Amino acid sequence: IPKNAEGKLPAIAVSGPFGAVKEQCSGLYAQTMAERGFITIAFDPSFTGESTGEPRRTASPDINTEDFLAAVDYLSMRDDVDAGRIAIIGICGWGGIALNAAAQDPRIKATAAITMYDMSRVSGNGYFDADDSEESRYSARKAWAEARSADLKNGTFTMAGGVVDPLPENAPRFVKDYYAYYKTPRGYHKRSGNSNDGWRTTGCQAYANTRFLYYINEIRSAVLIVHGEKAHSRYFGESAFRYMMDGKAEGYDFARKPNPVPVNKQLLIIPGASHCDLYDGGGKGMIPWDNIEEFLKKNLKR
C-alpha cells in the first residue's frame, strides 16, 4: 500500500516468472509499483511457494488463469481499492497467462506482459518451435505417460529439476542467464522451483496439449508487452502482439478477426536487454519502470 494513501486507489496483481515465487521478481514489481501510487499484491500461484494445492509444483492453464482472476476478486473487495481500476502484471510465463486472463475478464482494465513466454507454445512445440511435429509431441506424450505410471506405482512424484546445476560451459546464453539469476544470491530463494528441483516431471503436461491464447485478439482493454532486444523469448511476445492485433501471426495455427480496440495496445522492446534483465534490471536498470507506470496510470484513469 502506498505511503500516505487516501481514498480508493488503482490496484495491480503481479505474478511470475513461471516456476518462481513472490519473493523473487513479482515482489520487486509489486513493491516498485506500490511506491509509484498503486495498491499491489504479488502472489504465489497454486501448487507453488506458500500457496496451497497438491501435488506440489503442478501447472495448469485454467487454474493458473484462475489464480489471476482470484487476485482480482481479492483486490476488488478491498475498501481501499477502486474496483474499476484494476490491472495485472505477468512476468515470463505469467505474461502469457496474464494475456489469457485479460481475454477472459473485463474487470482487468490494463495488462503488462513482461519478458513473456507462451507456455502452451513452448511446452507443445519446444524452444523456437524446433519440436513442432506430431512425432515430437507423441514422443513427449509417451515419456509423460511412462512417468505418470511410474509415479503412481512408486507412490512418489519425481521432479524435473530446476535451472541446470552445475552449469555446462557450452550452455546456451539464456540458460547461463537463468543460472545467474536463480542459482546465485542475486535471485535464489529456497521455495523457488527454478532455484531448486523444478516442476513435477509431469507438472506442465497440461500446457503442452492446449493453445490458450486463442482469444487474445478480442482483448478490448489496454495491453503492454515488454521484451528485451536480446531476449531468447522475444519471439513469444512479438508473435502474441501480432496475433492480438491482426488475428494472425507466425506460431499461431489459427486466423481470426483483427482486434476491435487496437489503439491501446503497445509492444516495447528494450535495447540491449536479455530475458532475465527484465527480472530485476540485471544490475543495469533495464526495467522500464517509467513506461510501465505511465501505461498503467493512463489506462486506469477514471
Kindly label every feature range from the protein language model.
Residues 7-17:
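Short beta-strand element of the alpha/beta-hydrolase
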Residues 32-52:
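Conserved alpha/beta-hydrolase
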Residues 79-92:
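Alpha/beta-hydrolase fold nucleophile elbow
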Residues 19-31, 45, 237:
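The serine-hydrolase catalytic nucleophile loop
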Residues 58-79, 290:
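Alpha/beta-hydrolase active-site loop
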Residues 99-184:
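Alpha/beta-hydrolase-fold enzymes
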Residues 273-286:
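Catalytic histidine-centered segment of alpha/beta-hydrolase-like enzymes
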